[in-house]
Amino acid sequence: MASCATVCLPTCGTRLSGHSRSRSVWKLVSYITLLHFILKVFLVFLTSFHLLTQLSIKSGNLLSSLGVAARSQVQIKLRKKEQVEADLVEICFKETYLTRADMWQITTMLRESCVYHQKRIVFCDVIRCWVDSIFKNGRKVFSAYIGPNTNIVFRSESSRMIIIIQLSQETWHFEETGEIIFHRMVNSLLPDIFKQWEENEHHHTVTIVLFTSVSMDSHAVKLKRGEKAKDVQDFYRVVCDQVQLSQWEQIMVRLRFEFQNFAKEVLTESHAKSHTEIRGRILPSVKSNILGAITLAASLVHSPAIDRDLRRTNVEVIVVSPGSGVYEVEYDALYRASEKISSTEVGVDIICMSKAPLHVTPLFLYKPKKCSNQLEYCVPSWIDISYYGDSDFFTNQWVPRCKIYEIQMMGVMENELSAITIDYLNKPSGKKPLSEYCREYDASLFGPIAVELSVEDAASVVSKMRSDTFPKLPVKQLLSSKGSISSLHAPTAVTSKTPPPKASVKVADVRPSPAASKPRVSALTSLLAFGVRAEKSAPASPALSAVNTLSSIQSMDLRRDNDSVKRDTESIVTDDTVHNTKAEPRITEIAPIAPSLPFAPNLKPKKSTSTLSQSPTYNRIAATPDQEVERRSSLSQKVQMGLSGSPLDHRGKVAKAASANAKSINTETTPEKRNMMWRNIRTPSNISQDEMLDILTYSRWRTVYPQKTKRRSAKWKLLASPAALPLRTNIFPTVAELQTEYRFQVYDVSLDTDMENVLGIHGLFREMVSVRLCKGFQLAIGSRVRHVESQRSDGRPSAITTDIGKDALGAVVYLTTGDQVHRISCDYSGMMNVQIYHAIDKVDIEEPVFDIYARRTYSDKFKHFIFPPFDTSSKRLNWNLYDHSLAGYDTAGSAATQTRLNQLRVVLIPSFLSRSKNLGHDDSSEVYNAEEVRLDGLRRILGGIYRHSISRDEDKERAKIAPNLKFYTGELEDFLFQIVESNPAELAGGRDSLFMKRNQRFDKNIKLAQLATELQAPKGGIRFFDRRWHWKSYPHCFIGQDFVEWLIDNYSDIDTPDEAVAYGNELMKKDFFVHVEDRHAFLDGHYFYQLKSEYATEATDSKPAEEKSGWFNSKRSMASVSSEKSLGRFKGSRNQSVQSFGDFLSLSRVTSRSSNDQKEEEINPITVEISKSVRVDLDPSKKSYRPETVLIHHDRIHNPRKCFHLRFEWANTTPKFIEDYISGLTRTCERYGLKLVELPILEVSALLEHNPFASEITLDMPTLDQLSGLPPHVLEYYASDPHAIAREILHHFGFVIDTLSMSDWKLAEVQIRNSWGVPTYKYSQWVEKNGLLIAQVVGDQIIMIPNNLQLNRQSGAQSNAIQLQSEAQGIILEMQYLMCRSEKVRDMLGKVNLSPEASPGTMTPGEEGSKNGTPKLAIEAKMEGRVESPQVEWREDVEIAPEVEHKGGADGDENDEEGDEKSEEGDKGESENENAGMGMEQDGENENENENENENSKDNKANETTSEVKEVPAGVEIEHKEHVEEDKSDGPEPKKEDKGKEVEDDK
């Protein structure tokens, strides 16, 4: 059996020589315990060798941390695990998003092991963290054992910090040192924080917001305590949002500037140029809306606008307040804010700049609804507070805390001249003078005392006994003046099952009990006794009575120590049995009792059991003499202390609560539910130690700090590395609460048979717990959980666990959050049972909205905003559906919609290509230009995605083949109809590129004539159609990737794409088909080929010659085509439901006939799914303990002028695997001239609606009147399209279209949808080519926001972060400068000449104004003075092809490293080639492969491009701002037979 051993090392590393191995030497050397380890096998005979035994330590950080020389003498001692078990272990990590599920698994891995300081921990070979601190008994130790009671806290050194600086009245006050409080914030506090981040290399992102509350009441009235100001408005000034640490010096400058102007901006209102009015006044911190600021910051975590940052963990809200930690709040706001924040994982901390007061903090004052005139004090459990600048002098010695600013600011000569009045202290009403207390005390000792105790007082005692702590009551409440006791009797009690009317208890005839023969100590005792019953029994009224003397005490231990009273193991005394004791009790007649409590406290007598008898008219309670003697001395001392005015012992709560008001009686559930969010206290200045411990421990965050931590001191550990929400908690409702305050739901989950080998029962149990931990649940532990489980009929408290072992059968796990309790159990048959308790919200409180005035980072004035309240997603999540999805059941994709807890979206944009152009093909003689390199890069990405795809189909190998991408230029509808017209057989729904039924009818011995016939057959062949691409038309051609797929599906001896490509090259050698320009061999991709004339049949699907020659004249928009023509395109193609559209479309159309037998058909729109989803295994090497999968959505139809989209969705996957996968994608994209940019899920307008702190840049568009100098036909175009100017400006600054608006997808006969849902963007969205900015055109404005996701992803080094931020701000300033000067806009638009006959070659399809064939502008691509290197923008006519075989792709593409080294360093740029239809991607900025600058010919002059190329039709002149070399070798002249077919591109 394993034991725990301790290594004791010499304090100074003493080394003993060989001849001094005697016992005397052992005594001279002092040892300290440094290292603990698990000794699995300890052999006794090893001790006989004494000093000959050697201990070896592996090299590494442990050896260096010990600092012990080799061959030093050590001692090894066996220790019990409990002796060396740590209380708290802190584990730190950085640069990764670590979910709480992964924290749970790391905690399970470390259980029953020993750790030491700076020990490195590797989890799943991808997550790396280290042990930062180990605490035992409140002190740091070097090493310890992690046992079942050890709390493990995870701290992140890369978090998101939200700093809210409260600018209240006190902010402008001077301190005693003469420094303004705000200057102390920005000169001391914030620099200290940022300096720690920089020294420890922490990578936090910080958001700084200035906040204040302003009262708009014109009458300046001094607000009293508890009085709220009228017409209060909250102002927020966003200084910076999610910036890096490297810019903290600029932040300090910005903060000082904003502080100087903040008061002026919020207090003044300009009505005219010469009239400015001062309005309102800034409120002090105690009157400010601090809850609104905290809730608004916490809402960012659960906002729909939140995007998962894979490099940062935890969100910490830090409120810097000039006050002392006291705030007046409204009850409704306190309740809702506490409820919401208690259900989140956000840490909230307040740093006060003033000195710590002498009372408990943070202190919230509120008026309850039932008593609106009475203030109550409470300490919230979800806020931590600290005070900056308090030295040991202030903590160890008393200094005045009272601050009267008017007196402090007086001069020496002003003391006698100024009339400063200070209100007298309010004399407490109802309090007695000290002399009266003395008289009452004397009367209690030397004379009979009359006290009448009502049943309400007794019921209050019962209520107080049910709680864990008892508040201190004033001494006056101990002496009730309601009546008198004329004589005392022995105690009696009765329990009544029916609640009788209310009555009081009167006791007479004082007689000493037999046990009271000794001298009397005190004559005053008023303890109450009550019946005890089980929770399952019916509610009964407690029996109450008074006792006669101190000696006749009821059988109840006043001390209620944990050793004597344990609520979970106590015995239950029923009211059915009666046992009389030796003392003869006097019978007291008592009237029926009114108050009724459902459950009496379960208290157990210490020595003997008092028994209760039932009687309708009297009660009997008896006590043994032993009990009376035992409690005599201790009780008399407590009573004397209470009468003399000294504080009572905090354990003796019964006597103090005897006369509590009956109105304060609550059920068992109300205080407990409230205490989960805050603790009410009666006297903040005189709080007991127990109450303070309850405040510190009764919180979800109570295990974050070690024992004996000073609560008020500045916690630099928290500011440097915020802690994640602890995994375990002891907060749990009682049985009565679960029965009355919660709704119940139960269901069973069984594992799918297909998942048994993949996941297993143990894995399913673990995943169900893990996903709840990720949603903010905590593992419930403690006595309450065991007690609740024991009350179940089939309860097994011993089966409750927090660590799921390999044998999960029979285990039970409880998880809890603010409003839910989940019980997950696994029976011995493998069935998972889930029981969910939803808290019933009985409080009638409306959800508050955020009605604020905010000024964002780039705004110039405050604007009024109304943000909706946030809600935790755990309430909305369908746990039943989600758990079944984890078990392998996903019917109709419904579970997939519910389980998308985390989403991430990236796009691919062309970038500068400076590396090798090796595509990895076998034929090294092929020459590829930059566009083809990017084409192949996209193919490799898709190939890598599908290489590790997960499929349940029988043919799993085919599922790993990437699907074909479809590219189009022009209108999307025209492209879809072209596919249908070219091959109507695709509408039959029997063809699918991925899972098509194999028809292996042929082999390689087929005759060429037969092969040509089969290829061109209407059914079963491939598509032959006239392809128009980049001003040219190629008749009767097919695409290489279609032919590869057809060969694999129809040839019995061809199974892979490589075999298909090799066979295709053999056919080319036999002159079966050729490349349309004889430039390439047969390749798998978007390359055009034509059959030889002897094998080609008549192109029946080709359009007439007159239509070919007039492409732009015949081009129609579906929005303008009549319904007859539109329906005619599909007439006769199909009259039944359509299930698939080719190999990439998902179509559905319903055809029906009218009842009057008419021939007219009613056709519903076709549904086209333009994207496809695939589930990918991110851990093919099986490093993780579970399957690591992610659902990836990718485009199937793509316009090269737009971004190529990838969307990642996962529920319970380790984020580090996703981050590594995206990093591999990024490296692959860089090799092939593509840039991976991470974008938010929501559009810009939606982000601004949900995130009040988001940076917003608004640019007003110039009007047509300001552009009056432009040619008439240009003005006519801009008048017809209101968004054309905005599009041209965005193109000018290098923006690329990201996603079209929802209205652009609403086509006449086609309904567009994605694999993740229907498009929901209200406006078209653009992204800057480097991913720094995102823009939308809303009305007559351009709205932009910084892309913080991409900025934070690329900001690895500080220099890089500064460069990216500067570049983004440079673009913003240039755009603002341009928009402020209409003549600059006019000059920019005037540089492009547009002839009326010119084709709109550069207009993006689907955008506003592109439906009618209206001429559109082609803009110049060079942006003045900003681009340092040739830049790229995707054009509308770019071809990108997929890849079937992946050589690295997302996994790193290690095979291409050798080829990448062959890059030509002399490449400066690449020309655009107009022949992309022959396998060359036209993306608008082609870097030159070879330097042939001097070989430019007139035939290729139209192909010259700048760094950002926009295709320009004939007759359009472009003023070049940058010399770009043209590569003549990239595009030879078209063949003579094709020159006559050159036409202008449609788009």
From Swiss-Prot:
Entry GO MF terms: GTPase activator activity
Compositionally biased region (Basic and acidic residues): 1419-1450, 1495-1547
A Gene Ontology term for the protein's cellular component: vacuolar membrane
Domain DEP, first and last residues per copy: 1018-1093
Membrane topology type: Peripheral membrane protein
Positions of the UniProt region annotated as Disordered: 489-517, 597-632, 1393-1547
Biased composition (Acidic residues): 1451-1464, 1482-1494
Gene Ontology biological process: intracellular signal transduction; negative regulation of TORC1 signaling; positive regulation of autophagy
Broad class of where this protein is predominantly found: membrane
Pfam family, one: DEPDC5_CTD
Family note: Belongs to the IML1 family.
Protein name: Vacuolar membrane-associated protein IML1
